[in-house]
Amino acid sequence: MKSCLINVSLLILLLLPILGYASVNAESIDGENDFEEERGFGCFRSCWKAGHDDKTCKSMCG
C-alpha cells in the first residue's frame, strides 16, 4: 500500500509541470487570437474612416 501511494505521488509530481506548460501555452494562443481580432477590427475602422464601403473594406482587410 505504501509503495502504491509513493508511485501515485511521483506520477502526480511528474504530471504537474506538463499541465502547467499546457496551461501557459493555451493562454498565449488565446492572446494571439485576441491580437488578430483587434488588428482586423482596426483595419476595418481605418478603412471606414477613409470613406470606403463595407465591400471594399472586407476585401482589403480580409
Curated annotation (Swiss-Prot):
Expression sites (tissue/organ): Expressed by the venom gland.
Organism annotation: Heterometrus petersii (Asian forest scorpion)
Top-level taxon in the UniProt lineage: Eukaryota
Disulfide bonds: C43-C61, C47-C57
Free-text function comment from the UniProt entry: Shows structural homology with WaTx suggesting that it acts as a cell-penetrating peptide (CPP) with defensive purpose that induces pain by specifically activating mammalian sensory neuron TRPA1 channels. Has no effect on the voltage-gated potassium channels tested.
One GO molecular-function entry: ion channel regulator activity
Site label Basic residue of the functional dyad, positions: K58
Protein location: Secreted
Keyword line: Disulfide bond, Ion channel impairing toxin, Neurotoxin, Secreted, Signal, Toxin
Signal as UniProt keyword: yes
Annotated protein name in UniProt: Potassium channel toxin kappa-KTx 1.4
Sequence similarity: Belongs to the short scorpion toxin superfamily. Potassium channel inhibitor kappa-KTx family. Kappa-KTx 1 subfamily.
